[in-house]
Amino acid sequence: MRILVLGLDSPLGYALRSFATPLMRHEIVGVDMDTTRWRRERQVKKLIRRDSIDLILDARLVTQIDGVDPVGQPDIERTRWLAELAAKDGVSYLYLSSARVFSGTLTRPYRESDQPDATDPLGKTLIEVEELLKATLHEVFILRLGLMFGGRRPNPLARALDALARGDRIKVSEEVRGSPVHVAEVARVMHGIIDQMGAGAPRSGL
């Protein structure tokens, strides 16, 4: 499969590419995070139709969550452009979302079948993006991730370590809980999913 990775210069993007190169089962093409800050739909159309692709792997928003740039309305509009063009061209879509779609107020562990219930601005934006993709695309696979970390920056763990090295004071919340995952493990799982898609498995799911 020929895969367009949005956010190829992110820690996750580097991990995806490092897994793909030795396996040589799929061709990875992609754009850096700065390039994905499109201002017009025609910029997205030019990217998608420049070369024939089978799958869009969208790592934009899950990367921004762990960075310093806010996720907001412009990202929803860009996702709309991507989804409509992918639907028109018959391109499958693999979207990396976040567990932040859940509020964390349940007293039991969340299940993927639970209805997203986040009320904070970030969580509500992520929910809106997921709903937009499901409403627009027939072949969309959504994978929700927890906090990611790795050796490459930017990521929350690296920022915390850098701050400690400078002697800065770090503020954290007692109420935020999760299961951090290394970007290499995410990349391994992603390649497994893509392999199954390439072998004929359904290209939609949550």
What do the predicted segments below correspond to?
Residues 131-178, 185, 191-192:
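NAD(P)-dependent short-chain dehydrogenase/reductase
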Residues 170-171, 175, 197-206:
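A recurrent short beta-strand within the Rossmann-like NAD(P)-dependent oxidoreductase core
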Residues 6, 72, 76, 108-130, ...:
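Short-chain dehydrogenase/reductase
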Residues 6, 31, 59, 93-99, ...:
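SDR active-site strand-loop-helix element
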Residues 26-38:
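A short beta-strand-loop structural module common to alpha/beta enzyme folds
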Residues 80-119:
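Conserved Rossmann-fold NAD(P)-dependent oxidoreductase catalytic core, especially the SDR/UDP-sugar
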